[in-house]
Regions:
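Short, electropositive, low-hydrophobicity segments enriched in small/polar residues
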Residues: 13-15, 56, 99, 130
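Short glycine- and Lys/Arg-enriched binding-loop motifs that mark or flank ligand-binding interfaces
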Residues: 5-7, 65, 122
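A structural micro-motif
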Residues: 26, 63, 87-90
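Substrate-recognition "cap/lid" segment bordering the active-site pocket of phosphatases
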Residues: 44-48, 72-137
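Substrate-recognition element of Asp-dependent hydrolases with the DxDx(T/V) motif
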Residues: 56-81
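Surface-exposed amphipathic alpha-helices with a cationic face
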Residues: 54-61, 132-136
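N-terminal helical cap/lid subdomain that shapes the substrate entry/recognition surface
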Residues: 1-54, 61, 72
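Small/polar loops that bind or transfer phosphate-bearing groups
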Residues: 8, 67-68, 126-127
Length: 137
């Protein structure tokens, strides 16, 4: 289970690369395109915010908040919108929007710079080791 969570957290492209053992790039690209089309159409079918998330976001209203996901930015925004959460965030950064994906600290640094926040004044909340590793960078 932990291996599955780690693979999924690395993003769609890495997931497809690990599943499709064929080194043929067109095959991988076709599988990725088909998966993205399906995934995009069913983003929120089985996804719900963790209990207490909405109340917590409401309580943190005056603070700047961001989402950093290894998911493509367009899909991240679409999912947040479908879940009614987009309104809580000042910025959403996807795995295709920074020079590196989590666990790289690059997306965290980009968000802090964009929002004008010094690293020692920021808090990271995540649901995987990748989030913690990115925050420590």
């Amino acid at each position: 289970m932990e291996d599955t969570i780690k693979i999924v957290g690395e993003g769609l492209t890495r997931l497809i690369e690990k599943i499709v053992k064929d080194n043929n790039t067109p095959v991988k690209d076709a599988v990725l395109d088909r998966f993205i089309n399906y995934y995009s159409a069913h983003l929120a079918d089985f996804t719900r915010p963790y209990p207490g998330v909405i109340k917590t976001l409401e309580m943190l209203g005056r603070y700047k908040k961001a989402v950093i996901s290894n998911k493509r930015e367009s899909l991240s925004k679409k999912l947040l919108d479908q879940l009614g959460l987009m309104k809580f965030f000042d910025i959403v950064l996807g795995g295709d929007s920074a020079s590196g994906k989590k666990p790289s600290p690059a997306p965290v640094k980009k968000v802090l710079e964009t929002l004008g926040i010094e690293p020692h004044r920021a808090v990271i909340v995540g649901d995987s080791d990748l989030d913690i590793q990115a925050g420590k960078g």
